[in-house]
Amino acid sequence: MAMSIAARSACCGVAAPRSSTVRVAAARPAVRPSLRTAGQKAAPSRGVATKAVNELAMIAGEAEFIAGTALTMVGMTLVGLAIGFVLLRVESLVEEGKI
């Protein structure tokens, strides 16, 4: 013989359950149906490709500035090397006593 919920709560000292109209967190589905599952492919994103093209165009527009800066740095390096070798030659002449 099965006891009713009211009789069971009365004999055991347990409060009667709340009305079934009250929503609780556990009653909600665990996963929203709008989320992708593992088997579905993502929709192609065009925003990233557009940003990449824009970035490439901006860099291409700065090519003259980048090339000029690179040539300046190469020139400064070569001048520094030339000065260094001249100083080495002067040092060797001083050690030999020719200067």
UniProtKB/Swiss-Prot annotation:
Chief site of localization: plastid
Keyword Transport listed: yes
Segment forming the signal sequence: none
Listed SUPFAM superfamilies: PetM subunit of the cytochrome b6f complex
Topology within the bilayer: Single-pass membrane protein
InterPro entries with a match to the protein in the record: PetM_cyt_b6/f_cplx_su7 (IPR012595)
One GO term describing the cellular component: cytochrome b6f complex
Residues exposed to the Stromal side: 89-99
Pfam families (alphabetical): PetM
Membrane side Lumenal: residue ranges: 61-67
Subcellular location: Plastid, Chloroplast thylakoid membrane
Domain of life from the UniProt record: Eukaryota
Segments passing through the bilayer: 68-88
Keyword Transport in annotation: yes
Similarity-based family: Belongs to the PetM family.
Record-given protein name: Cytochrome b6-f complex subunit 7, chloroplastic
Gene behind this protein: petM
